[in-house]
Amino acid sequence: MARIQIPVEEFKGRVARAAKLVAEKGLDVLVVNGSEADYADTRYFSNFWPLFERCGVAIAANGEAALMVGPESQVFAGDFSWMDRVCVVYQYRESANPAYPELKSETFRDVFKKLGVTGDSIKIGVAAKLNTNCVQFEGLRECYPHAEIVWADDIMLALRRIKSDNEIACIREAARITDLATKAVMAELKPGKTELELVGVAQKCIYENGAEYEGLPMYCFAEKSTRHAISRSSYKVIEYGDIVQLNLSAKICGYSPSIGLPVCCGKLTQEKRDLVQFGLEAHYWTEQQIKAGVLASDIAKRFIEFYEKAGRRANYFYGPCHGTGLIEVEAPWMETISDYPLEPNMTFQIDTFVTSPTFGLRWEKPIAVTADGCVNLAPSQIGTNGPIEVEV
């Protein structure tokens, strides 16, 4: 069976669409930055995921583009990316800050010249604001002291917010593998297991079934750690009656949806059952609100009202959805100030996190917006039989 992935022609089309937006915005060139931890914007164009070092993509208004990498990644990038213009730029070196005294690297000016961008008083757009470090920004300023440098994250949001059929296929395949891993972990859940042992079960399963990597650090944590909105699994030993939060994710061509559900190792107490059931109801309520044309802020505001009407305002932390794609959580979020309408083929994680002083829980799955609702991109609905208790 053919491997599910993004074809080279689609990557080329992304560069072309970006170049058009660069020109419309009055920019001469766009610089997009990424890292091993958050590669989404740079991989969107290059299909390259850096290791240790950072990377960048430069796209000129004329459609020419280059991948910029650190000194150790030139051959690596040349083998993994479809881009044939790979430039070593010192500002993308690793955090150990090696000097590489024998290396002659290129400057941003050298790279831009290769793209046909000349002159001193140019206008440079920089995207991935939170992934652009001061070394990269200062490198641009040193090369172009007379340039106008502006943030251009709006270009990336415009490009990435609507998913192609190939992107949705990657999300579906990653979710299929994640579902297998979730079932494998539940089959191994019992008192005496550590959280990290369960992570190992999930990792083994996703690689055996075709994932390129974990989509996020696998969540398998119990009891008080379930209060963490984000966390890491530990050496904690799981005990009978513990509520265990699973949030697993496989990665396919970079696309990293997750499936999250709370599982009890044994029988739930009534307190836990009530909160788990409320979270599931809030999750299903959210799913029913999603369709093209609805304002994201309206869903977010009414989501909070749902908690308030149930007397659960103290259990609210955030929600109800965030974008998903090349990273498990990406823009846009659905928040009370998110005044944009939902559009077909926008993809989100319905992320229903409920917290309390002693434990928390999350029901989560990937969906795609349709004209009259949304479609679940996971292979099956979560929580169909209510709160999950694993017999041990």
Give the ranges of each region predicted by the language model.
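Active-site neighborhoods and metal-handling regions in enzymes and metal-associated proteins
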Residues: 1-392
